């Protein structure tokens, strides 16, 4: 029974970490350099995260400065930002890109919350898939007479209880992100 708990905890922890990582790329009221983690730049034929080919700094509350390590990448970085879903318009001075970030409108904040909700739902499905996988494994062990029917019932109940707990954590992470997005 402990093996199921350990396996469930391991897989669900990965689900939660992945959710938090994906939420970092959503734009909120606060500017964060992790916004650019998912922006991919064509770097010698390879799609490379922007943060690996340039220094991203935030010198002021509403200003982002992107300084590429290789000046020849400036136009490619600019194109990558323009084609991303960040809705940002960089301006170049030949050495660095500057992005003046406008305050998010209420409508845009609501769109981002919808996007965050959709992401949370996808991760709840992933959590349920982990539950289903472990349930199948336990049922197979019972079918092969490796565990008793009572053990199976106990294992399935434990898996369900723990899955509910992890789904609640996903909801808590979503609620925190919603609060952060709607904060002015």
Curated annotation (Swiss-Prot):
Disulfide bonds: none annotated. Responsible for the release of ribosomes from messenger RNA at the termination of protein biosynthesis. May increase the efficiency of translation by recycling ribosomes from one round of translation to another. Gene3D superfamilies: 3.30.1360.40, Ribosome-recycling factor. GO terms for cellular component: cytoplasm. InterPro entries: Ribosome_recyc_fac, Ribosome_recyc_fac_dom, RRF_sf. GO terms for biological process: translational termination. One of its GO terms (molecular function) is ribosomal large subunit binding. It holds the Pfam family RRF. HAMAP family: RRF (MF_00040). It is found in: Cytoplasm. Belongs to the RRF family. The keyword Calcium does not apply. NCBIfam families: frr. PANTHER family: MITOCHONDRIAL RIBOSOME RECYCLING FACTOR PSEUDO 1, RIBOSOME RECYCLING FACTOR. Keywords: Cytoplasm, Protein biosynthesis. SUPFAM superfamilies: Ribosome recycling factor, RRF. This is Ribosome-recycling factor.
